[in-house]
Amino acid sequence: MTSFDAIVIGGGHNGLTAAAALSRGGRKVMVLEAHQKAGGALRGDSFHPGFQANGPAQIVNRLDPDVAKLLALPDNLAGGRDVPTVVLSDRVEPAILESAYGERIRGVSKDEADRFRLLRDTLISQAGILRRFLKRTPPPLKAVGISDLAALGSAGLALLLKGREESRDFLRMLLMNVADIGDEYLTDDRLKALIAFDATLGVQLGPRSPTSLLGLYYRLTGEANGHVGGQFVPEGGVAALGEAFV
């Protein structure tokens, strides 16, 4: 019987990345996937010979540069054409957020655009404090090591360097719900709906659930094309990126 050093259950993009990292480290890895084709949300489906549609994932907004390097992804898949976010309404023209999560906004008043940029800059700055923990192994509950304490200490120092007022604001917002944050900073229901959607996509929380803002922090810890909060469509669509993961 063939033996393996590691068995990864699930051939989605996370499972495939884990398998690739283990394999590069010299481990013999088996990936188990229930579907006949690996890729998970990145998996595309052919609906006619010569034509392929994307699966659940339509855009890329959290492709870690280290993962792209690990998988040796070509430039046309690791980056691509920046795509805007369009928020539709049946009463007014659409709000269009361009560049990295609304650096430029069309379809809203100047005052509202300024309010959104203030919120955007605040959230990106705060998400940067949490970002340092994403690639760390969670500490064991019974034996927190020196490196874990050092990571917490560096996060605390980064928070202190932002000043007392910003530090208090971060600690206040950290456990809040995204709906209250939207009401606090914004007046346009389209933009409120956008941040609520991004904060709760893929999680079992509603916009008024406590801690739902954490989902938006997570969204803004990622980057695309070198820009925090950006999003793009790779050449050939997301399905082409999924094939590269395999």
What do these predicted regions represent?
Residues 2-144:
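N-terminal glycine-rich phosphate/pyrophosphate-binding loop and immediately adjacent elements
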Residues 124-246:
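Active-site/ligand-binding neighborhood in enzyme catalytic cores
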